[in-house]
Amino acid sequence: MAAGGLSRSERKAAERVRRLREEQQRERLRQVSRILRKAATERSAEEGRLLAESEDLVTELQGRSRRREGLKRRQEEVCDDPEELQRKVRELASAVRNAKYLVVYTGAGISTAASIPDYRGPNGVWTLLQKGRSVSAADLSEAEPTLTHMSITRLHEQKLVQHVVSQNCDGLHLRSGLPRSAMSELHGNMYIEVCTACTPNREYVRVFDVTERTALHRHQTGRTCHKCGGQLRDTIVHFGERGTLGQPLNWEAATEAASKADTILCLGSSLKVLKKYPHLWCMTKPPSRRPKLYIVNLQWTPKDDWAALKLHGKCDDVMQLLMDELGLEIPRYSRWQDPIFSLATPLRAGEEGSHSRKSLCRSREEPGPGDRGAPLSSAPILGGWFGRGCTKRTKRKKVT
């Protein structure tokens, strides 16, 4: 035994005492918790004394309860009543008209109307998985740009929106006709694969989801570059990764747009990820010089307290009202005019079997090149960029 130290038996005895005290504390915590769940009128005199003797535990448990309730409220969807929403839209329309440089940030909420589930909403993928429910999604190739996507494109055409920064990988901004120079797809695009061996990187736009075989830190798609023969990779930025590609992420343009913006409109984003990108919020500027923030979302966001206006409504509903207020017609999406068909690089001979995803086609009846008859209806989510997002949560659960 070292001088001044404890013997092995003394250390064991001290450890037993420590564990006993911890167990006694846990039991007392359980007792206090059970008592607090009772109405004050139903508590016995002995229970009242126990609460009085356990002020610290009572304070701790009440704090936990308040935090749980706060988190629950944040997850709830709230809708403004029609009159309130209309009033807010008029205020938003005034901001859009008067903005010198308006940037739009978009999230999964603008694509739910296209049957692409979000992650965090009440019917979102992670929410359902946490409840132990199965998750399915319609074939993503069946998704089409929503009213919100088409409205944003029209606003850009009218020079009311200067740039769009999107978290979505679904390619619907591209397919709505928004110029690629006017958008930054921070987390990639499911229709684009690139050759990083070429300088500058060579892009291949496809008419199918290129992410079928890719995953976190494993981005090769199995196809090769037509010029140098190098392996092609997808452009998706998975949870836990840092995007390094120039396009379609276009971080340089996103950062420049944010620095110029005097107004930012956030549509359908929880902002839980975007808030971590400081360059998008100009927080180094004094408050008076930061862009005014307008948020459209049904749930709480961490930027609500910074917003000049928060609109609780579905994106399509708000954008319909906004476009009416601005006197602008919303263009209809047409598959025949979808830009992806003119941008796409066809597969070479021998590459037709390199994927099993359903290809986009100008007519719904027309089979896409290289198709293997993927189902059109809802099906369990398997692989690809969306499926990988789902497994982020399912892997946390142990299968017994």
Swiss-Prot record:
State the Gene Ontology terms under molecular function. Answer: chromatin binding; histone H3K18 deacetylase activity, NAD-dependent; metal ion binding; NAD+ binding; NAD-dependent protein lysine deacetylase activity; NAD-dependent protein-lysine depropionylase activity; protein-glutaryllysine deglutarylase activity; protein-succinyllysine desuccinylase activity
Which residue positions does Omega-N-methylarginine occur at?
R388
Q: Explain how, and how many, cofactor molecules are bound.
A: Binds 1 zinc ion per subunit.
The cross-references to CDD domains, in alphabetical order and at most eight, read: SIRT7
Q: Where is the active site?
A: H187 (proton acceptor)
Residue stretches spanning the membrane: none
Pfam (any one): SIR2
Q: What is the activity-regulation note? A: NAD-dependent protein-lysine deacetylase and deacylase activities are activated by nucleic acids. Histone deacetylase activity is activated by DNA. Protein-lysine deacylase activity is activated by RNA. H3K18Ac histone deacetylase activity is inhibited by methylation at Arg-388. H3K18Ac histone deacetylase activity is inhibited by deubiquitination by USP7.
Which biological process annotations from GO are given for this protein?
DNA repair; DNA repair-dependent chromatin remodeling; homologous chromosome pairing at meiosis; negative regulation of protein ubiquitination; negative regulation of transcription by RNA polymerase II; osteoblast differentiation; positive regulation of gluconeogenesis; positive regulation of rRNA processing
Q: How is it modified after translation?
A: Phosphorylated during mitosis. Methylation at Arg-388 by PRMT6 inhibits the H3K18Ac histone deacetylase activity, promoting mitochondria biogenesis and maintaining mitochondria respiration.
Q: Which cofactor does it need?
A: Zn(2+)
Quote the biased-composition stretches of kind Basic and acidic residues, using this chain's numbering: 8-28
Region feature (Disordered): 1-28, 354-380
Is Nucleus a UniProt keyword of this protein? yes
Tell me which UniProt keywords the record has, alphabetically.
Chromatin regulator, Chromosome, Cytoplasm, DNA damage, DNA repair, Metal-binding, Methylation, NAD, Nucleus, Phosphoprotein, Repressor, Transcription, Transcription regulation, Transferase, Ubl conjugation, Zinc
Question: Catalysed reaction per UniProt?
Answer: N(6)-acetyl-L-lysyl-[protein] + NAD(+) + H2O = 2''-O-acetyl-ADP-D-ribose + nicotinamide + L-lysyl-[protein]; N(6)-glutaryl-L-lysyl-[protein] + NAD(+) + H2O = 2''-O-glutaryl-ADP-D-ribose + nicotinamide + L-lysyl-[protein]; N(6)-succinyl-L-lysyl-[protein] + NAD(+) + H2O = 2''-O-succinyl-ADP-D-ribose + nicotinamide + L-lysyl-[protein]; N(6)-propanoyl-L-lysyl-[protein] + NAD(+) + H2O = 3''-O-propanoyl-ADP-D-ribose + nicotinamide + L-lysyl-[protein]
What biological function has been recorded for the protein in this entry? NAD-dependent protein-lysine deacylase that can act both as a deacetylase or deacylase (desuccinylase, depropionylase, deglutarylase and dedecanoylase), depending on the context. Specifically mediates deacetylation of histone H3 at 'Lys-18' (H3K18Ac). In contrast to other histone deacetylases, displays strong preference for a specific histone mark, H3K18Ac, directly linked to control of gene expression. H3K18Ac is mainly present around the transcription start site of genes and has been linked to activation of nuclear hormone receptors; SIRT7 thereby acts as a transcription repressor.
Give the protein family. Answer: Belongs to the sirtuin family. Class IV subfamily.
Q: How does it assemble?
A: Interacts with UBTF and the RNA polymerase I complex. Interacts with components of the B-WICH complex, such as MYBBP1A, SMARCA5/SNF2H and BAZ1B/WSTF. Interacts with ELK4, leading to stabilization at target promoters for H3K18Ac deacetylation. Interacts with histone H2A and/or histone H2B. Interacts with DNMT1. Interacts with SIRT1.
Q: What is this protein called?
A: NAD-dependent protein deacetylase sirtuin-7
